[in-house]
Amino acid sequence: MCELDQLSEMGSKAAVNRRQFAAIGAMAALAAGVKAQAQAAGGLSERNVTFAAPGGTLDGFFVHPASGKHPGVILWPDIAGLRDAKKVMARRLATAGYSVLVPNPFYRSAPAPQFKDFEDWRANGGMQKVGPWMQQNTPAAVADTTKAVVAWLDQQASVDTAKGIGVQGYCMSGPWTIIGAAAVPGRIKAAASFHGGGLVGDAP
């Protein structure tokens, strides 16, 4: 699991060593290759989107196969928010035959991107910046947002409403997958939390 104290410690250690830099370079090359392959095949359609949601206007990134209807997927980013790395992940899912929305998890506070990448988050006081934003994402707020996201997805021509929606979350947003599935059980049929933080707590 990924906990807030671990994230705070990461934020105080912003330096990147040579091995980390090499890994980042390799990931960037892979990301570029995936995007170029998809674009060359002409198989994907993508766009930035905005729509009304509880507490404000939600902005996000939507990508799907260029033709046909496909199961919807909600991809909640981690604490560094909607950024290029998450768009790459969404494109990879879309190439597998899904209509993927990456919502800005902090839309109530600031439009995306809030950070260029995770290193930008670490080096520029990311934890201090997002702390107040995170407080707005209560379980009730996340449930309400998920309902709006599902409603929006179901209005898209590329989404197959006869099939269930999947939701995945990372670190901070890991619990959101469970909250979302409970909020819209008739539509969300699969939930995956990756190194989710705050999955359990002391409060009843």
Regions found by a protein language model. Give the residues of each.
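Short amphipathic alpha-helix adjacent to the substrate-entry channel of hydrolases
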Residues: 84-103, 107-112
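Gly/Ser-rich "nucleophile elbow"/oxyanion-hole loop immediately N-terminal to the catalytic nucleophile
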Residues: 118-166
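Primarily recognizes the serine-hydrolase "nucleophile elbow" in alpha/beta-hydrolase
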Residues: 146-204
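Flexible "cap/lid" loop of the alpha/beta hydrolase fold
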Residues: 112-120, 197-204
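N-terminal cap/lid segment of alpha/beta-hydrolase-fold proteins
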Residues: 37-68
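N-terminal secretory signal peptides
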Residues: 1-16
